[in-house]
């Protein structure tokens, strides 16, 4: 059987239009089929089907050549990386005129991309956003099934953004996407590292492996004059700065030795009305007021300013954040006739719960009532830690279901309960709507109710099915706001 070098296939793609497929059911005569390795189902199993449907070339690993039949095998070590190379040629994404800014980290990605979008729109730019809530650019918007799209979909989106005259793109880059090479073939003008706290350890072996997945955004996607910024207020950001000396740091602590350039921030005041911050970078000092609350949002604002200064903006441009009202499902206030302080937030990790509950605690609410749960078929080790965070910072803990998926909600709740040992008051109710109703009945003026875990989501996954469910809609229905 004749083999074909990858370079030759790339030359063929440059000369003529050949469809690239990763799903054998979509194969057309003369196309390229890339057999992606998988954790549950391996793409190599579908090579015979792709060949029978007319695939001309099969990108595969050495041990899969025997299945290629009449198709020409392209043997590679990493089919996922190769897919990105081919997609870059097919969609011409190597010649994009718009800069792409990638944001990675456990928490803060969505808020940072929204803040960047708001800032650059205020400057008159046509912006694109790819992230947890939506994929959107001028003339297009759709709900996001994945934080970071699959490789072919991502290249197709970027190509369309270019056609639609998008001028700058802000992209959330998840650890899954980095591990699975979904962003292969993409050149980033700038990258941001926010933080790293426990999450996704059902996927990554441990925190070290989780960190190395995130760090790939800094190491494996080189581009000319790449801007790299990272928080120095957490150990993982400082570790990253040791590995990448060019990083520009930001934080509220004194400048660490790992970085030569550092955006230093101070919180001058924090209240229910918002934040008053002071920043200094090199010889410049400026202040900023915003309706956003919480230290975590102050950190998000530092990240945005750190990279924006490198993209040519000036401190006076940041005054637009005085009118920034927030992100859907991120400490989102539910306005109601009873004037109760009710918030919905996406917090679904121990650290995210600590951040949002601390923000509410710091602005002086009398009591904090928290409705929360843990997702099924996800990192079980974080469940008691989430309970511990809620017990420490809430007056009433209402434990319920999140997206139970294929686990028994009662068993998920049982995993959380050890962390709630020191809670002042515990209510358990697996039915999420009933749990929210019980929590609302407990709220008095001066209290804060936080409904955590689902944020912007409009479905609840039970088993393999997704059912319509929105925390915001449920709250409004209970309060008669609809």
Curated annotation (Swiss-Prot):
<dbReference type="GO" id="GO:0000287">
    <property type="term" value="F:magnesium ion binding"/>
</dbReference>
<feature type="binding site">
    <location>
        <begin position="147"/>
        <end position="148"/>
    </location>
    <ligand>
        <name>UDP-N-acetyl-alpha-D-muramoyl-L-alanyl-D-glutamate</name>
    </ligand>
</feature>
<keyword id="KW-0132">Cell division</keyword>
<protein>
    <recommendedName>
        <fullName>UDP-N-acetylmuramoyl-L-alanyl-D-glutamate--2,6-diaminopimelate ligase</fullName>
        <ecNumber>6.3.2.13</ecNumber>
    </recommendedName>
</protein>
<feature type="binding site">
    <location>
        <position position="453"/>
    </location>
    <ligand>
        <name>meso-2,6-diaminopimelate</name>
    </ligand>
</feature>
<keyword id="KW-0133">Cell shape</keyword>
<keyword id="KW-0547">Nucleotide-binding</keyword>
<dbReference type="Pfam" id="PF08245">
    <property type="entry name" value="Mur_ligase_M"/>
</dbReference>
<dbReference type="InterPro" id="IPR013221">
    <property type="entry name" value="Mur_ligase_cen"/>
</dbReference>
<feature type="binding site">
    <location>
        <position position="457"/>
    </location>
    <ligand>
        <name>meso-2,6-diaminopimelate</name>
    </ligand>
</feature>
<feature type="binding site">
    <location>
        <begin position="105"/>
        <end position="111"/>
    </location>
    <ligand>
        <name>ATP</name>
    </ligand>
</feature>
<feature type="binding site">
    <location>
        <position position="24"/>
    </location>
    <ligand>
        <name>UDP-N-acetyl-alpha-D-muramoyl-L-alanyl-D-glutamate</name>
    </ligand>
</feature>
<comment type="similarity">
    <text>Belongs to the MurCDEF family. MurE subfamily.</text>
</comment>
<keyword id="KW-0436">Ligase</keyword>
<comment type="function">
    <text>Catalyzes the addition of meso-diaminopimelic acid to the nucleotide precursor UDP-N-acetylmuramoyl-L-alanyl-D-glutamate (UMAG) in the biosynthesis of bacterial cell-wall peptidoglycan.</text>
</comment>
<keyword id="KW-0961">Cell wall biogenesis/degradation</keyword>
<feature type="binding site">
    <location>
        <position position="174"/>
    </location>
    <ligand>
        <name>UDP-N-acetyl-alpha-D-muramoyl-L-alanyl-D-glutamate</name>
    </ligand>
</feature>
<dbReference type="InterPro" id="IPR000713">
    <property type="entry name" value="Mur_ligase_N"/>
</dbReference>
<feature type="short sequence motif" description="Meso-diaminopimelate recognition motif">
    <location>
        <begin position="402"/>
        <end position="405"/>
    </location>
</feature>
<comment type="pathway">
    <text>Cell wall biogenesis; peptidoglycan biosynthesis.</text>
</comment>
<feature type="binding site">
    <location>
        <position position="180"/>
    </location>
    <ligand>
        <name>UDP-N-acetyl-alpha-D-muramoyl-L-alanyl-D-glutamate</name>
    </ligand>
</feature>
<dbReference type="GO" id="GO:0008360">
    <property type="term" value="P:regulation of cell shape"/>
</dbReference>
<dbReference type="GO" id="GO:0051301">
    <property type="term" value="P:cell division"/>
</dbReference>
<dbReference type="GO" id="GO:0008765">
    <property type="term" value="F:UDP-N-acetylmuramoylalanyl-D-glutamate-2,6-diaminopimelate ligase activity"/>
</dbReference>
<dbReference type="InterPro" id="IPR036565">
    <property type="entry name" value="Mur-like_cat_sf"/>
</dbReference>
<keyword id="KW-0963">Cytoplasm</keyword>
<keyword id="KW-0067">ATP-binding</keyword>
<dbReference type="InterPro" id="IPR004101">
    <property type="entry name" value="Mur_ligase_C"/>
</dbReference>
<dbReference type="Pfam" id="PF02875">
    <property type="entry name" value="Mur_ligase_C"/>
</dbReference>
<feature type="binding site">
    <location>
        <position position="378"/>
    </location>
    <ligand>
        <name>meso-2,6-diaminopimelate</name>
    </ligand>
</feature>
<dbReference type="GO" id="GO:0005524">
    <property type="term" value="F:ATP binding"/>
</dbReference>
<feature type="modified residue" description="N6-carboxylysine">
    <location>
        <position position="214"/>
    </location>
</feature>
<feature type="binding site">
    <location>
        <begin position="402"/>
        <end position="405"/>
    </location>
    <ligand>
        <name>meso-2,6-diaminopimelate</name>
    </ligand>
</feature>
<keyword id="KW-0460">Magnesium</keyword>
<dbReference type="InterPro" id="IPR035911">
    <property type="entry name" value="MurE/MurF_N"/>
</dbReference>
<dbReference type="InterPro" id="IPR036615">
    <property type="entry name" value="Mur_ligase_C_dom_sf"/>
</dbReference>
<dbReference type="Pfam" id="PF01225">
    <property type="entry name" value="Mur_ligase"/>
</dbReference>
<dbReference type="GO" id="GO:0005737">
    <property type="term" value="C:cytoplasm"/>
</dbReference>
<dbReference type="GO" id="GO:0009252">
    <property type="term" value="P:peptidoglycan biosynthetic process"/>
</dbReference>
<keyword id="KW-0131">Cell cycle</keyword>
<dbReference type="GO" id="GO:0071555">
    <property type="term" value="P:cell wall organization"/>
</dbReference>
<feature type="binding site">
    <location>
        <position position="182"/>
    </location>
    <ligand>
        <name>UDP-N-acetyl-alpha-D-muramoyl-L-alanyl-D-glutamate</name>
    </ligand>
</feature>
């Amino acid at each position: 059987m004749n083999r074909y070098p990858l370079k030759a296939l790339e030359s063929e793609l440059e000369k003529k239009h050949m469809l690239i497929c990763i799903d054998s059911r979509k194969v057309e005569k003369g196309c390229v089929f890339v057999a992606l390795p998988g954790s549950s189902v391996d793409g190599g199993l579908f090579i015979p089907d792709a060949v029978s449907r007319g695939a001309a070339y099969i990108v595969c690993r050495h041990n899969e050549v025997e299945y290629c039949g009449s198709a020409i095998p392209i043997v590679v070590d990493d089919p996922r990386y190769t897919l990105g190379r081919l997609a870059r040629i097919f969609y011409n994404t190597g010649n994009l005129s718009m800069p792409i800014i990638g944001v990675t980290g456990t928490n803060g990605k969505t808020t940072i991309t929204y803040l960047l979008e708001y800032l650059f729109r205020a400057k008159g730019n046509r912006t694109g956003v790819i992230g947890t809530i939506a994929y959107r650019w001028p003339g297009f918007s759709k709900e996001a099934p994945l934080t970071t799209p699959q490789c072919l979909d991502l290249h197709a989106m970027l190509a369309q953004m270019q056609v639609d005259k998008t001028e700058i793109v802000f992209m959330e880059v998840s650890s899954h996407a980095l591990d699975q090479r979904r962003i292969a073939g993409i050149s980033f003008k700038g990258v941001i590292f926010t933080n790293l706290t426990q999450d996704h350890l059902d996927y990554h072996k441990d925190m070290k492996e989780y960190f190395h997945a995130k760090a790939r955004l800094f190491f494996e996607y080189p581009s000319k004059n790449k801007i790299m910024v990272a928080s120095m207020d957490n150990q993982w950001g400082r570790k990253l700065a040791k590995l990448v000396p060019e990083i520009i740091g930001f934080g509220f602590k004194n400048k660490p030795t790992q970085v030569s350039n550092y955006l230093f921030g101070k919180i001058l005041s924090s209240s229910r009305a918002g934040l008053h911050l002071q920043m200094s970078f090199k010889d410049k000092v400026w202040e900023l007021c915003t309706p956003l609350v919480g230290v975590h949002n102050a950190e998000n604002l530092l990240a945005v300013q750190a990279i924006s200064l490198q993209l040519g903006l000036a401190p006076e441009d940041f005054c637009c954040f005085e009118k920034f009202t927030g992100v859907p499902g991120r400490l989102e206030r539910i306005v109601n006739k009873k004037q109760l302080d009710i918030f919905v937030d996406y917090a679904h990790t121990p650290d995210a719960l600590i951040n949002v509950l601390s923000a509410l605690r710091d602005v002086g609410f009398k009591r904090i009532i928290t409705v929360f749960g843990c997702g099924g078929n996800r990192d079980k080790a974080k469940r008691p830690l989430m309970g511990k965070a809620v017990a420490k910072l809430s007056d009433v803990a209402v434990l319920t279901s999140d997206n139970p998926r294929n686990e028994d909600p009662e068993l998920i709740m049982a995993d959380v309960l050890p962390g709630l040992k020191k809670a002042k008051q515990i209510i358990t109710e697996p039915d999420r709507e009933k749990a929210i109703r019980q929590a609302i009945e407990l709220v008095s003026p001066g209290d804060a109710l936080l409904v955590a875990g689902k944020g912007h989501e409009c479905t609840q996954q039970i088993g393999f099915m997704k059912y319509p469910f929105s925390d915001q809609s449920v709250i409004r229905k209970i309060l008669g706001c609809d």
